[in-house]
Regions:
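Positively charged n-region of N-terminal signal peptides that target proteins for export
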Residues: 1-4
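Bacterial N-terminal signal peptides
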Residues: 7-16
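Intrinsically disordered, low-complexity polar segments enriched in Ser/Thr/Pro and acidic
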Residues: 19-20
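Auxiliary tRNA-acceptor-end handling modules of aminoacyl-tRNA synthetases
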Residues: 23-321, 327, 331
Length: 331
């Protein structure tokens, strides 16, 4: 009897042990799913690389908001140009601010002027083109598209687009070389230098003094030094001449003024144009240069009455003008 009980107990123990082994193995085994989750959690996310715009912004510098946002970072000047400004016409005018004695030209006189516009060539390149038009056609005519495609405006400067402001989409370009260099926008051309008897520009003695931006214009002041052949002026005898220039960049109205044909009986300055038509003909027109005067009282103006303009023509008299001359200048 004892032998049977012992045999039965051993049988139960063997059965229990057989089933217990798999249970203990399951306890020690690692869950492959959990390991995968741990690996995903510990995996480092790739670091976001800074673009050139973000790297430059970290350097700080000064900032002005206006027609174009202007940044001055270390020794360089930058414009942030919005998409809306591409293709818009701007008038660039450069004048003398101060000149050497006996230079032959006076402060306030014009150095050059140009109508320009910005054009994006690709994601990395922007052009500054001169709007050089002497041929035109009625926009409603079929030939106007042919005139547009068959002609092209000169590129006066090329910018590298450094990057974009991700919030505003404005494109950042470096304008330092544009305003420190000699070109038709902000300095002298080779022909201009010959006329005023200036030699080559001295880069190490040429500086951008200030760039100030306003709602519809930007003002750039530069100090320039040129080599010079000895002449009658004391400055030229030193072998160099230094002068100060100011360049104004003014945004022109989006809707251009209605052109008016010249009449030889009235003394206006004019601009000559060749106008093409669908009839395979062309004619020479002269468009006068005039102020954009819009009558304040249009009904009275239509009746032939003298009325005031919406925007007055304003002349500024230099505060250095002798007081006894001022009344006569106003008259």
């Amino acid at each position: 009897m004892k032998h049977l009980i012992a045999t039965f107990a051993l049988s139960i123990l063997t059965t229990t042990t057989t089933w217990a082994v798999p249970h203990s193995l399951n306890t020690w085994a690692k869950d492959s799913t959990e390991v995968k989750k741990d690996n995903e959690t510990n995996k480092k996310k790739p670091e976001k690389k800074e673009d050139d715009y973000e790297k430059l912004m970290k350097k700080g510098g000064s900032f002005q908001q206006g027609l174009f946002d202007v940044r001055h970072i270390e020794k360089d000047w930058y414009f942030e140009i919005p998409e809306a400004a591409l293709g818009r016409l701007f008038l660039a005018v450069t004048r003398f601010v101060s000149v050497p004695q006996d230079f032959g030209m006076l402060s306030g006189e014009e150095v050059n002027y140009n109508t320009v516009y910005f054009e994006r060539y690709d994601d990395k390149t922007m052009f500054l083109r001169s709007w050089a038009h002497s041929q035109t056609a009625d926009p409603k005519s079929n030939i106007s598209e042919l005139v547009r495609k068959a002609t092209i405006d000169p590129i006066v400067y090329k910018f590298d687009i450094i990057g974009k402001d991700k919030k505003t989409g404005k494109m950042l370009v470096n304008v330092t070389k544009l305003f420190k260099g000699d070109n038709k926008i902000a300095g002298f051309t080779a022909n201009d230098r010959t006329q005023v008897k200036l030699g080559t520009l001295q880069d190490d003695r040429t500086f951008i003094d200030t760039i100030k931006t306003y709602p519809i214009n930007i003002e750039v002041s530069t100090l320039r030094t040129y080599a010079a052949n000895p002449g009658k002026s004391m400055a030229s005898r030193q072998g160099f001449m230094t002068l100060s220039l100011n360049t104004s960049i003014v945004q022109l109205p989006e809707e251009p003024m209605r052109p008016r044909l010249a009449d030889e009986r009235v003394g206006y300055f004019d601009n000559r144009l060749v106008t093409f038509s669908d009839r395979e003909t062309s004619k020479h027109d002269a468009i006068i240069s005039r102020y954009r005067l819009v009558p304040k009282d249009k009904k009275a103006y239509a009746k032939g009455k003298l009325v005031e303009p919406e925007k007055q023509i304003v002349y500024y008299i230099d505060p250095a003008t002798p007081k006894e001359w001022v009344p006569y200048l106003i008259q």
